């Protein structure tokens, strides 16, 4: 159940029921900036914790210091969406890491955080927009993934306060 409190001028959404199932970082871009060409082959690494650096991104990730005020310093993807796409496309042997989102959450509808500030494990974020799927999703996951993920591709955000997120599920 979400709780709301006012801190300064912003309303911050918090929830004690948000789970973090997986955390991922990657040192390089496989698909981003590769439109019309082949993907690259940078690994995506699962980690037990990630360091969020306010205004910059995730320590060790490809988007840290990408550009000033970048709206995708961190990305979130719902475990529930992962489960539903696996069922919908009958794909059972792909990790959620193929979607190249940083934080795999459970227990929250990520679309409710678009345009809002929220807090997870003491770290504050602002949801900026849906992390829209691209045509690479069909290659990375399965045919039909891009279409299925429209409107549920995850959340892009900026990091407002520094801190550490940890897997807790």
What name fits each language-model region?
Residues 160, 164-169:
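Short glycine/proline-centered loop/turn elements that form peptide/ligand docking sites
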Residues 105-161:
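Glycine-rich active-site loops that engage anionic ligands at enzyme catalytic sites
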Residues 1-120, 129:
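Electropositive, beta-rich accessory/interaction domains or terminal extensions
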């Amino acid at each position: 159940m979400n709780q709301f409190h006012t801190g300064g001028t912003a309303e911050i959404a918090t929830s004690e029921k948000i789970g973090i199932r997986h955390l991922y970082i990657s040192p390089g871009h496989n698909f981003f900036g590769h439109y019309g060409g082949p993907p690259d082959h940078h690994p995506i690494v699962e980690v037990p914790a990630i360091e969020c650096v306010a205004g910059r991104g995730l320590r060790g990730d490809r988007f840290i210091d990408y550009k000033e005020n970048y709206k995708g310093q961190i990305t979130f993807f719902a475990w529930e969406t992962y489960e539903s796409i696996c069922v919908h496309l009958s794909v059972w042997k792909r990790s959620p890491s193929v979607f190249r989102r940083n934080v795999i959450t459970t227990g929250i509808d990520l679309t409710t955080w678009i345009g809002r500030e929220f807090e997870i494990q003491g770290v504050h974020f602002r949801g900026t927009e849906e992390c829209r799927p691209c045509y690479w999703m069909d290659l990375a996951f399965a045919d039909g993934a891009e279409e299925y993920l429209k409107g549920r591709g995850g959340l892009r955000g900026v990091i407002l306060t520094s801190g550490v997120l940890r897997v807790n599920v």
